[in-house]
Amino acid sequence: MVQKQTSAGGRRTQRNVPAQLNSFNPSVFAEALGRLGGDEELLRELAAILVDDVPPLVDGVQNAIESGDFGEAYRDAHALKGLVVTFDERGCGLLISELMTALKEENSHEIHRLSRSCIDAVENLRSNCKRLLD
């Protein structure tokens, strides 16, 4: 299935982002494939959905946070989490859960601290999904 692999190229990882999110990592897809009962076609379909649906949700989270609408940011973050947990529940999914908690508590400091890490992690997962589809 996924044979290509690239290194992190010496990039420093962010403290809150697991190292597996900083380079193409076939093990992310191996775990997802296991959760999907080995159905590679379904994995690719879900990857395509993630690739298409992530940008507007990320924009929605960012815009809602910037405008102080934490309820809307929470809803978009929840939808974003639903897209990523099949692929990476312990990385992206966990970061988004932490962001959702901060949004629910309206903890501005934590929201701003976590939002960048979440977005970076989700964008990296999206990039990996694009590679899977190539």
Tell me the role of every PLM-derived stretch:
Residues 1-134:
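Two-component system phosphorelay core
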